[in-house]
């Protein structure tokens, strides 16, 4: 990589170690360095993040990580530096090393992601979305958010940025949604999201239909699904204050023409949909929507509310249309819950049922056999694997 200038001064004498070569880049990354040399140095760093050994080499370099964060925002090197951090954070095996080298990295990335003037805020959000998939970095990020001013918490700022069109005119901030989904795996984040006085869930619901980004839709649906694990909030989620179910069902609905009797059983927002109504195109998002509804059926009152709002009708048509076997299987399980008999007394809350160890093992074996069957069904088809953004 001659263009990066990384080998300058390396000719003659014993060959320098890779770590020493990386250290030589630091003067070119400092504020005030010649623009062309700075750009070449950052391009070299970005190239190194394209392979495992390169990422491992960079992850432990605290000074280099800090230098990447401090590049001037308007420069092209800052863009490449932000992308290098996205690639570093995409490697779960390096998260511990990254945090050890730079414990303040999550907080600084969050500051960049939520700065409405920062041009590379989307890259900062993507790096955080990658980093927060693992428990330790996620906990560090939650601590950084909790350290924000009580009147304007970090989570509130995150939700506001996600839900405000044009919050940053130069960055779409779609990756704030998967970041929020990762954070919502933690009880403290769910407590914030489900606080009735904050109206956070209500602000997120319209984004389940966001047309311009599957990343944003998927992150929001993942967040809502995680909130549905809190069965003590199901009555509130399904009730008139939130009315979550139509927002989960609408992306699963197609252009089917129901009878008048069936139409009356559906929520108003799902009645008389246009003939060009399209279902959610992403199979992973469809599966999360089905899983969220399944969680809402964990209690007897929840099951009754889901039944009363005609969910079975939407799921019946989804099952007939669904091309993906794993989504179809999830749909079948939910339909069985809705049309099956109620559990015996004392077993009404499915999330609190204690499953004997031998039964749990049998269920795991059944799941394995189910997965093998799905793989056999898929085998003859020449599926093209979708690229996953880093």
Swiss-Prot record:
A matching Pfam family: DUF383
Keyword Cell membrane included in the entry's annotation: no
Q: What keywords sit in the KW lines? A: Acetylation, Phosphoprotein
Please give the residue positions where the record annotates the modification Phosphoserine.
17, 214
Region: Disordered, residue numbers: 371-390
Query: Which PANTHER family does the annotation name?
Result: PROTEIN HGH1 HOMOLOG
**What is the protein's given name?**
Protein HGH1 homolog
């Amino acid at each position: 990589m001659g263009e990066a200038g990384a080998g300058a001064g390396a000719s003659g004498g014993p060959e320098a170690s890779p770590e020493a070569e990386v250290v030589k880049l630091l003067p070119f990354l400092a504020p005030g360095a010649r623009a062309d040399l700075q750009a070449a140095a950052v391009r070299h760093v970005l190239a190194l993040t394209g392979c495992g050994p390169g990422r491992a080499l960079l992850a432990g370099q605290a000074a280099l990580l800090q230098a990447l964060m401090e590049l001037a925002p308007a420069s092209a090197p800052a863009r490449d530096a932000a992308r290098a951090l996205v690639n570093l954070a995409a490697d779960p095996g390096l998260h511990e090393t990254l945090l050890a080298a730079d414990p303040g990295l999550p907080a600084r990335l969050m500051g960049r992601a939520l700065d409405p003037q920062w041009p590379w805020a989307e890259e900062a959000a993507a790096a955080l979305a990658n980093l927060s998939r693992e428990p330790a970095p996620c906990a560090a990020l939650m601590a950084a958010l909790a350290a924000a001013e009580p009147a304007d918490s970090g989570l509130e700022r995150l939700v506001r940025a996600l839900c405000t069109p044009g919050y940053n005119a130069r960055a779409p901030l779609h990756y704030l949604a998967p970041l929020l989904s990762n954070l919502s795996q933690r009880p403290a984040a769910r407590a914030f999201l489900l606080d009735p006085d904050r109206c956070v869930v209500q602000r997120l619901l319209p984004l389940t239909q966001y047309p311009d980004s599957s990343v944003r839709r998927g992150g929001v649906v993942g967040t809502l699904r995680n909130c549905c694990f809190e069965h003590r909030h199901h009555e509130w989620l399904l009730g008139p204050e939130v009315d979550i179910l139509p927002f989960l069902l609408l992306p699963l609905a197609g252009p089917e023409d129901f009878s008048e009797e069936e139409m009356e059983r559906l929520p108003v927002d799902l009645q008389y949909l246009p003939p060009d109504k399209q279902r959610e195109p992403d199979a992973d998002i469809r599966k999360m929507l089905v899983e969220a509804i399944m969680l809402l059926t964990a209690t007897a009152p929840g099951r009754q509310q889901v039944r009363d709002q005609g969910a079975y009708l939407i799921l019946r048509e989804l099952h007939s249309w669904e091309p993906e076997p794993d989504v179809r299987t999830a749909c079948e399980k939910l339909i069985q819950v809705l049309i099956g008999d109620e559990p015996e007394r004392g077993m009404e809350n499915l999330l609190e049922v204690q499953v004997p160890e031998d039964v749990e093992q049998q269920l795991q074996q059944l799941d394995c056999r189910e997965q093998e069957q799905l793989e056999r069904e898929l085998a003859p088809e020449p599926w093209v694997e979708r690229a996953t953004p880093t």
